[in-house]
Structures are given as structure tokens and as C-alpha cells.
């Protein structure tokens, strides 16, 4: 049921829109506008039955009116279209600050009361409904996860089209009217979102109808698209691959019923064109259509007072938030509010008991076709577990035969093979997204069973590889689009992963933050939202091996962003460091089974050793961290002189090389590897973290700990501040030093190289005793750097090192040239 077919999608209407429906839509618009104002302004007396006084007005007036009446108008017509066509539909509200429209909609269609039975369909329930909006102990101001029917909060603007198109992928019956605010249209992500129509197929995917809500103003400025000429505006959308329609209303004295008739007729014309596109695609999906889009030009704050305090309000930026900010404090503003609310004639819309009259809702859809009840907008309801192949078949087994530390393997290639077979087993519910980096990040085994979906013309097979009009891989050079597509794909019940160069995950820091907030709200207080599949993000081409790029591409700091989400036991973020290919496989298996998470998986793509077996990886992953007993030489914590800890593939490599040298000196140590970073956090802050007892047993209670960490050192310092023995931790991480240089030089400039780590370990044990050795190591670092400067490659003592337990198999070793692989093969 992952892609449920609801109703009878893509059927044209064989009759005109009825006059009863026209009248019903006008009543809906009036009642929704009234309820939207009530949510912003009223705390009591919701129908103004009792003497209406300033005491009925909230003390703090919070919310946004400007976009709301236009949204209410559109929702009336979308509801009518769903009912008349029995069309499976999810609604995207780009200007999510029009939240009163979304909550009013779900109250009117009945789903709000079904999910929140205390909000009854009577006057008492209406009062609670009004009072709770943007109120202490109440609900947020936006189209938040608390609202039935929402998959897009619209808080941070820019992602409406990304979410709309992600929702329709592999969902051929789904129609997504996507409202885009004309202010939102100025954001970067939205600007590139128009190109999404080249990445879907009308045969195998659904249809998005972009609706530009062109009300002319933002918070305090006009919008760009509202001020360009009609010709330029229409040419812009034609250039984006759309067939633009335009509807204009609200700027004269046209009767509202006439406006509804005009819009209903236009909406039918547009939907007929969509049905024709769907029908044609069944026999020809190679010709990309020009999809319809709608420019909806109406006044900002439509139907509010035209002037307040002598200043133009309707049709201006002054209508953006709360037009009557002093409605409680001044009689003049209160009287204007009263007249405004009375203008909707609530007595014609509500029964005596406060319930909404039947003739207001008669035209609306029923059952799961209701916007608030559509299972696609509560994806956990329809989510099915992935059919995962057995992981053992992808294991790098050479480590068993040749020893820990064997080989030179590009870890993500194993993940690519795993994803290939997941797609094979789940051909319409698993996707891979990438910003032109799927091959670069070594996931190209997926092309053995699928293609990159691309509906934008083809040239010679000499240059257009692995491309087709259908496929489970989607690439666009936009991290925003990749994250947005995946989020919506998950929110509508499916599964997936996307990969990015580590430094450029920062492009979508705030998107991760927004999605985390959605998940946090869900797991805390919205039990009716069923768990969705996790955002899985492969973070590769990382700071330590950005071989083809330089300082601009070296920033592992997304770890710090995600760590800010770990303090309330919501458990919506995970940070995993894959030591090698087998660990990456174990992590992927766990992530693909998980729900309601953001899983950031750090794994380098360059050839590297395989340190542990798959069984060892699974055991370590379960614990979050583990001692590598085969690498330790201390028999007990009492015997330990220093703990050598690492998180990340390159830090692990350098710690292991340092341990080899320290072992030859007779130093007693234990080696600890950390895969699940958040398990280090104080168990007082995180009830899934390891206990203090386990922490002390792993890292010792009183011995020095040298921790080589993939990202910024303060991450670890912040996590362990309340842990036993934290004062004895020395954390070495990325120090904001780098360039396009050799692997040794990259770790050298950040004091992460094996020689610096060996010297630091000796310093922690007894700086005076080992002063000569420390000096010798520092001098060798200079020699090794000079070798790289003179020759352009690293010194053999660095590149040729192999862990001593390895039975060297020459066929597993790569030359220095091969060990720096390209970005696109």
C-alpha cells in the first residue's frame, strides 16, 4: 500500500460545475476567512452571540492574515475539484504562515476533530479551536505537523516545489496543487525548484500544479514577480517548461459568486489539460509536456478592511500579519474588527449549536479523499518495511583471511551494491538522490538496475550515460532539491538516501533543522502521525581526502548542527562514522530499518583499509563504541598507559599507525573506536547514551585518552563534559587548516597525522621521559612535508605502511596514483 490509489484519478468532469458547488465554495471561503480571523484574534465568544467586547480579543495578537484569504479561496476550489473528480490529492502550502487556512480547512472537513476529539464541532469546540492558535499550550502559527493533511510546514521558505515533486515520484495517481508565495519565489531553492518538471515522468509519477500566489507584497516590500510585465512573467514560466494560466480577481467590485464561477471554469480547463498529459504519457512518455501552472493574482489581505487608520491595508504589505494590532486596546480598532467579522455573515454559516451548516460542506470530498485524511499526508500509515537483501553477501571478507587492516577498498562502492539490490527488491519505493555526485560518491552500482531519471532531451550515448525517462536515481546540482525531494518521498511513505560532499551539506543545514523540528514535534506530541522512514545522508568526499579540491571543500561542521538536536530524548538525529566498508554496510542496514531519524553517515570514498568483519561492525554499532581488543596490548585498564580512541576513517587510520609505533616502543594502550557519536553524550541528557559505568570501563576511569576525531574537537568536548575522566581527554580534530594537497599534508596541518598522534600520546604519558622521541617525531614531520613539496607525493614511510598483523596480498594494494580516484568514475 506504499502508493495507494484513492478515488478515480485523472478523470475529466462530464458536466459543468454545479451552481450548488459554486455557492458552497463561496460559503466555505466565508467560513474559512471567519475562522482564520477568529484564530488570530479571539479567545472567547467565537460566534459573537453574546455581547461582543474587547475582553473577547486575545491579549497578544499573533499570526498572518495577508496570505490567508487567498489560500482559503484556493482550498475551497481544490476541495471541490477533489470531490467532483474523486482525485487523490495532497496540498502543499508554501506560504505556511497562512496556517489559519490549513487548520480551518481540516476543521471544516472534519479531520481536525477526528484527531483532536476535544475540539468538538460545536460552539465550545470552536472556542477552543480559536483560543489555541499561537497561544500558550496551544498550536503553532504555521501549517505545522499538528495539522492534518500537512506534509510541508512552510516555516523556512523555499522548499514548496521540492516537497511537491518529491511527493509525486513513484506516485502516479497523486495530484499536488502547490501554492507558492510570491515572496517565497524569490528564494534560491524555490527558484531552482521550477526545474523539477524535467526530473519526473507523467506516466510513472503524479502531477504537480504550481500555483503562484501573486498578492504583490512581502512583509514590507513589493515582490519582484508582481512588478514585472505580464509578458515577462508569462515568458519566464514558459522558459521554465510550463504553460502559464493567469487568474485575476479582487481588484474591483465583481460579485464573489462570479469570481468563483470564473475560477471553477479555469480550474476545469487546467485539470482537463493535466488529464490529457496523463493519458498521452501512457503511450508516449518520451516527449516532455509543458505542464500547466497558475498565476493567482489577488490582493494581499483580500476581504479585510481596505483602509485602517487612513492607511491602505487590503492590497498592501500592511495586511501581512495582524492588520488590527490594537483591537483589544482601542475601541476604534475593536469596532473595525467587529464589522470585519460580521461582513462574512456567520449566522448564515453556523447552526445554533455552533456547528457548521451542512450546505457549507456538501460540495466537499468524503472519507480518505479529504485533504486532512489522505494517507499520503500521513506517510507512516502506508509505509512498508524495505525488503532488504542479506547483508553478508556484500561483506569485505578479505579481512577474515588476511587480517585486520587488510586491503584498499572504497567503502561507498559496497554501499552502492547494497543500494542496487534494494532498488531491485523495492522498485517503486526506494530512491537515490544526488547533487551530481552519485558516481563521485561511489554509488554507481545502482545503474546496473536503474537509471537517472531525466526528461529533458538526449544527445549521443557517448555522453548521455545511464539516463532514462524513468529511474530510481535523481540528480540535480542542488542540495536543497535533493534534501527536499527525499523529505517528501519519505513523508509520503517511501524510503531513500542521498549523498553529498561533506562541506556542501552545510548548504542544507537549515533544511535538516526544519525537518528535525518536524520529527521532534511528531515524536513528542502527535501520536496519530505514524513513523516515517529516516532521512539517510551519506556524507562523503570529506575533509581529510578532498583530493581534487581544496580549502573551500573542507568543512565537517554539519556534525555540530546535528548535535544541537540531542538534548530532549527525542532521538531524531544520529551521527555515524564508518571506519571501513563493513562498518558502512552495518550502518546502512540499521538506517534503512530506522524511522523518524536524520542519519548522517560519514564515510570516505578513497581506497582504505578494512579493519573489522561485518559481525564485529554490527556488535560495535549496537554498542556505539568498542575496544578493538585485537589492536590493544594492555590486558586491563590498570595496565593502560594511554587510551587511543578514534571516530572516522582517516582518524582511525592514523591512530592505528600511531598504535603500531607505540607498540614497538613498549607503550601499553587500548584502542577504542567510536561509530555512534551521540552515544558519548552524558546519559543524564540522553537516555540512549552509554552509562557512566560503561563509559569509564571503555575509556578508563583515570588514564589519559587521546581521541582523534573526524570533525571539530569541540563536538566531543561538549558531549563528554559531564563524563567520568573527561579532564583526561585530549581531542584532536579538524583545525580549519587545509588546501589542495597530499593526504599526509592534510592530516599534518591539523596535527592529526600518526607522528603527531604518537608524539602527543608520549607527551600525555611522560613528556620529560620521551622528550627526545617527541622531538624526533616532530623533525620527521618536517622531513615528510618537505618530501611532499619536493616530489608532489607523500613519503613512502607514510604511504607504504600496513598494519603489522596483515598478511600482505599484493593484489589488494593500490599505487599512490590509483589511491586518489576521480570524481566521476
Curated annotation (Swiss-Prot):
- GO BP terms, alphabetized: carbohydrate metabolic process
GO terms of molecular function:
aldehyde-lyase activity; magnesium ion binding
Q: Which Gene3D superfamilies match?
A: 3.40.50.920, 3.40.50.970
Q: What is its EC number?
A: 4.1.2.-
Q: Is Transmembrane one of the keywords?
A: no
TM region(s), chain numbering: none
* Keyword line: Lyase, Thiamine pyrophosphate
Which cysteine pairs make disulfide bonds? none
- Required co-factors: thiamine diphosphate
Q: Which domain of life is it from?
A: Bacteria
Under the heading Pfam families, the entry gives: XFP, XFP_C, XFP_N
Q: Which family does it belong to?
A: Belongs to the XFP family.
Q: What is this protein called?
A: Probable phosphoketolase
Q: Which organism is it from?
A: Bifidobacterium animalis subsp. lactis (strain AD011)
